[in-house]
Amino acid sequence: MSTASPPSSPDPLNRASIPPGWGDTIVLLGRILIGGIFVQSGFDKLMGLDAFAAGLAARGLPAALVPVLAPIGASGEFFGGLAIVFGLMTRCAALLMITFVIVATLISHRFWVFQAAERRAQTVHFAKNVAIIGGFLFLFVTGGGRYCLDRWWCSNK
């Protein structure tokens, strides 16, 4: 009869290497950094909705869809970014932002239609957006951490 205890499952976040209390602070900082850029960019689009719509039309979106997609895209970017920053419905917000970034990337950074230097620049933007999607995937898995409205919301029901 073996007295050895079963191996414990590995901690996928390797929390043992993070000082106590820092993990949630780092998640908060990450949320502010990744969400903040979308808040700022979405706000700019909302304040200049006509220019944003013109840019979408110039990228080849059907003219009938532009008046619908421009406010939806700008609002989704702004409010999705706010939800990430404040940790409100973090996992849902992360999925919303993944969808937003995929659509925005396929509309604005189609590197395969460009030549030479512009192709290289658009490839960098495309790859950057793929990395941002990776950040949102992490938020989807980890949630908002201790310092988020999700935690307050769930504890007050």
Protein language model annotation of sequence segments:
Residues 1-50, 64-75, 79, 86-157:
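Extended, low-polarity transmembrane helix blocks
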Residues 53-64:
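Perimembrane loop-to-helix junctions flanking transmembrane segments
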